[in-house]
Amino acid sequence: MKSSVPSLLIACLVMSLNSYTQQVLYCPPTPAPENVTEFVCNSPSLHEFPTGFPARAKMISVEFTQVSSLGVEALQGLPNLQELHLSNNRLKTLPSGLFRNLPQLHTLDLSTNHLEDLPPEIFTNASSLILLPLSENQLAELHPSWFQTLGELRILGLDHNQVKEIPISCFDKLKKLTSLDLSFNLLRRLAPEMFSGLDNLEKLILESNPIQCIVGRTFHWHPKLTVLSLKNSSLTNIMGFFQPLEQLELLDLSDNELTTMEPPVYKTSANLSLDLSGNPWACDCRLDNLLTWVNEHNIHLYSKEEIVCASPKHFKGECATSLHKSQICPC
């Protein structure tokens, strides 16, 4: 008896193709049926932001276009708009007041544009925002006024910009924020006042910044933090920085300049994972203490084979986790 699997696969593919071809993407001035509330205008040849979106529109996507500016009235008359996707365009700035009269807007994607700055009160009337990706732009400064009315915000993406410092209390109104991505910027120093107010923060991504200094108690007021990435920074010392973070599930310290380290936390969560790879470790009694702590607390180590000794000379290039205690710490 011949298998019916190929015929079933063909049937499924045909059904999927039919469904795809039947899906019509509407963009003004093309008229849309009254039940259509989502509009997609993603033509690479589009140079001007479309006009004529109906008041019932709930989602508008104008992405992967040549659009470089929006008029201050571009989004007026859209009281039901919930999602606005403007990524992968050529936007350089936005007019103040652009997002007024959008009481239901919860998602605003401005990623992958050419934004160098934004008006101080650009998000003042966007108080319902939950998701705000500003990643992959050219922002060099953060203005605290941007975030003063975003009390509902949960996810903020500021990665892949040119931010050199975070103003004091910049995020202190973001009481509900759970995820903050500041990776691939130019931060050199971290201090407690930079992250004040982020009482519910669970995920903080700081990797690929030239961070050389972390002021004591920087992370002491973020007990809910479960993911912290400082990968690919320039850290040489992290003594005591993470002790209050008892709910940590992932701590990524890979690709730094660490030669030695005390156990990063006293009390660990049941499923803590740790990445120590890519550092120039000194394979001595201090490292043995760290690895003993890892084993005793059942810590999961990522990339064990890349935890390599840089010193002493007779251990250089050796995998630290494969060495016996009597070799590393013979005393």
Swiss-Prot record:
Cellular localisation: Secreted
PANTHER family from the UniProt entry: IG(IMMUNOGLOBULIN) AND LRR(LEUCINE RICH REPEAT) DOMAINS, LEUCINE RICH REPEAT CONTAINING 53
CC per GO annotation: extracellular region
Protein origin, superkingdom: Eukaryota
Identification of the protein by name: Phospholipase A2 inhibitor
Quaternary structure, from the entry: Homotrimer.
Glycan attachment residues as annotated in the record: 35, 125, 232, 271
Placement of LRR repeats on the sequence: 78-101, 103-125, 127-149, 150-173, 175-197, 199-221, 223-244, 245-268
